[in-house]
Amino acid sequence: MSRLPSGGRIDRTHPLRFHFNRTPYDAYHGDTLASALLANDVRVVAQSVTYGRPRGVFSAGVEEPNALVHVGHETMLRATQVELVDGLDAVGLNGRGRLSAEPDTGRCDKVYAHCEVLVIGGGRAGITAALEASQSGDRVIVADEQAELGGRLLGAAWTDWLETSLAALRSRPDVRLLTRATAFGHYDQNLVLIAQRRAGGGRLWQVRAKRVVIATGAHERPLIFANNDHPGIMLAGAARTYINRYGVAPGKRAVIFTNNDSTDPVADDLKRAGLTVEAVIDVRSGEAVVDTIPSPLAGEGQGGGCLGAVVIAQLIGKGPRRELECDLLCVSGGFNPTLHLFSQAQGRLRYDEGLACFIPDVAPTNVDVVGAAAGDLGGRGQGSIMPYWVVPSDGREWSTHFVDLERDVTVADVRRAP
């Protein structure tokens, strides 16, 4: 078991029982399927769609490309988004999956709502915007895709400000907080469509807002190197989330591979959770992880292609390579602001060389972007960053450098594209 003896936001007084690939496991209320599998040392969750390579949990949120599962009649669900309930029965998705021929028995409804301010995103920036807007008595709606408001703060070691702020919002009668609510459409005159997940069926919110605040945060980017898809490789921020939010140690011996400063607190949290941090490999120091070696262990979950070691080399010159044994590789290549809704609303973007990402440039009328979505990545701790996208390997062989883990797209595929 990789469950930490204390910590996390899970309810340890409320144990749950679930099945994955016909094997029973134990978990707690507040777990996702992904966190519960990691807690039970299940590392291989599925196989890749084209090559059938073993894949494990890579992230902790909606951006998960690997851990795709079937639950009941629903397929292509991300284990990081599946909230665990007692008796849940899930199967890892191997290949492309198949839609169920059974009719959907869920009952869905729709709600029309109006407000002065709609805040999309319930992280620190979104909660701050909602607090400011609600002070004047405006009707405020906050929508967030997660089961809890808090965003990245849920994966941090401190949450005092979050609890105090949420209590203040809940005490204000004109504030409505929507969880499990994904904004997926931003149309003319600030009409926003929101899909809310509920037991027994979904709900479609059609919200007309005088002003929309986009506080959708940013997604962490990976770094691309040979065999960067082994189970045991995950985003650095995800490792921190599993420790602090779910009380799970995602490994025992960790290596961190980065090009920015956001991994400093990750290393601290890994050590505090009892993991050994074997090394921090920073491309700004002239080193990189150039390849990975699978574990010699066999068997689904415990081994079967899981990470066993990393190969480290100098970026310039031909110095000696070295191998480090590890079962967890935390990667961070910087952050991309989440600007899909901003672009759909006809907002204009520009590329920021210093941040190595696109950020908002010209916003539509009555639309504001705040926090990490606006390029304010100080809260992510990114600090200085050395843009670095692909680590070359000997002979420039690109067929195992995965760009799109979900669809098995490699650097070789991109180079062949017209």
Show the residue positions of the predicted features.
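Residues forming the flavin
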Residues: 1-418
